[in-house]
Swiss-Prot record:
Belongs to the protease inhibitor I6 (cereal trypsin/alpha-amylase inhibitor) family. The disulfide bonds are essential for the inhibitor activity. It comes from the Eukaryota. Residues 1-30 form the signal peptide. It comes from Triticum aestivum. This is Alpha-amylase inhibitor 0.28. The gene is IMA1.
């Protein structure tokens, strides 16, 4: 008899715990498919070398060679988790700034302001026709929200 009581008690406990986890976890910014993109969890951020070259060329108004565009789009499409694509573009952009020693409000390259490079990088998924999710459920082609306005990007 006591085994039945323990069994039912554990069952009720698990149901309550699962319900609470779903309720509170769904509202957490640390849960969801984007949380799998965190390097601390073992995710390997893509260098996006082709996109790096494409964004630099576009920002200064140069023609982007077809091979560079193709490389960038393939590298972006190769990121299996759609939720990680904008984050990887953001990491790529930060590494460009670091490489060039860019400070806030400065030109990244001659004729290319930082804000323009941010918007150029944010639009790469649209240029490449590579799907990315956004919070509204649409599969917009531009990195969503205020990504391009973040001061650290």
């Amino acid at each position: 008899m006591w085994m039945k009581t323990v069994f039912w008690g554990l069952l009720v406990f698990m149901l309550v715990a699962t319900t609470m986890a779903v309720e509170y976890g769904a509202r957490s910014h640390n849960s969801g498919p984007w949380s799998w993109c965190n390097p601390a969890t073992g995710y390997k951020v893509s260098a996006l070398t082709g996109c790096r070259a494409m964004v630099k060329l576009q920002c200064v108004g140069s023609q982007v060679p077809e091979a560079v565009l193709r490389d960038c789009c393939q590298q972006l499409a190769d990121i299996n988790n759609e939720w990680c694509r904008c984050g990887d573009l953001s990491s790529m952009l930060r590494s460009v700034y670091q490489e060039l020693g860019v400070r806030e409000g400065k030109e990244v390259l001659p004729g290319c302001r930082k804000e323009v490079m941010k918007l150029t990088a944010a639009s790469v998924p649209e240029v490449c026709k590579v799907p990315i999710p956004n919070p509204s459920g649409d599969r917009a082609g531009v990195c969503y929200g205020d990504w391009a306005a973040y001061p650290d990007v």
